[in-house]
A protein has these predicted regions:
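Short His-centered aromatic/hydrophobic patch
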Residues: 83-89, 111
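Active-site proximal beta-strand in glycosyltransferases
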Residues: 3-5, 97-115, 132, 143
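A short, active-site helix/loop in glycosyltransferases that binds the activated sugar's phosphate group
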Residues: 138-162
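N-terminal subdomain of nucleotide-sugar transferases
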Residues: 1-37
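Conserved nucleotide-sugar phosphate-binding/catalytic loop shared by glycosyltransferases and other
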Residues: 24-64, 71-75, 160-161
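Nucleotide-sugar donor phosphate/pyrophosphate-binding loop at the beta->alpha transition
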Residues: 16-17, 60-67, 106, 116-134
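Membrane-proximal helix-turn-helix segments that form the acceptor-binding/catalytic region
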Residues: 23-28, 67-70, 125-142
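Alpha-helix capping/helix-boundary segments
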Residues: 40, 87-88, 148-150
Length: 162
């Protein structure tokens, strides 16, 4: 059976934005998985995985979340892994890159607004731009939601972005 995994650090993100996509995947024969730090029941999700994500990227607990996510990716063969939210996006792509099943899954990342943008501080650019540029090599498809992010993503030299 085909499998898709949605990753976000909080379940509210999935509940507010991705239920139609989970339903479409289910309707097309996919087993749907969601990895978040919550326990609320998510419609159209066959299997939920509680990962101890923390909102702050500097929180030490995110190291544990990385290991939990990598274990999940090693134990389950996913066809598609779709990462969301800043922490979910970073940890999801890194865990995939360090998993034994990375040759199987295609990894998607939806940038719901980069932290570096025209009016962002220099610190945001110094911190977040290099991280996203580095992680681009672990991204098969990057989806952006605004023109400025699309323009910035072109500098990452990805093979696919929208």
């Amino acid at each position: 059976m085909k499998r898709v995994l949605f990753i976000a650090h909080v379940e509210s993100h999935i509940l507010h934005f991705h239920l139609p996509f989970l339903k479409i995947f289910q309707d097309n024969g996919y087993e749907t998985h969601v990895a978040t730090n919550g326990k609320e029941i998510i419609p159209y999700c066959n299997i939920q995985h509680n990962i101890c994500f923390e909102r702050s990227p500097l929180n030490i607990n995110n190291i544990k979340a990385f290991h939990e996510l990598r274990k999940l990716l090693n134990e389950t063969e996913f066809d598609i892994i779709h990462c969301h939210t800043p922490v979910g996006g970073v940890l999801g792509r890194l865990a995939w890159a360090h998993s034994k099943n990375k040759e199987i899954a295609k990894i998607f990342y939806t940038a719901h607004g980069f932290h570096f943008y025209n009016k962002a501080s220099s610190l945001s650019w110094l911190l977040y731009y290099p991280i996203e540029k580095y992680l681009a090599k672990y991204t098969d498809v990057l989806l952006t939601i605004n023109e400025e992010d699309y323009t910035n993503a072109q500098q990452f030299h990805l093979h696919k972005f929208r």
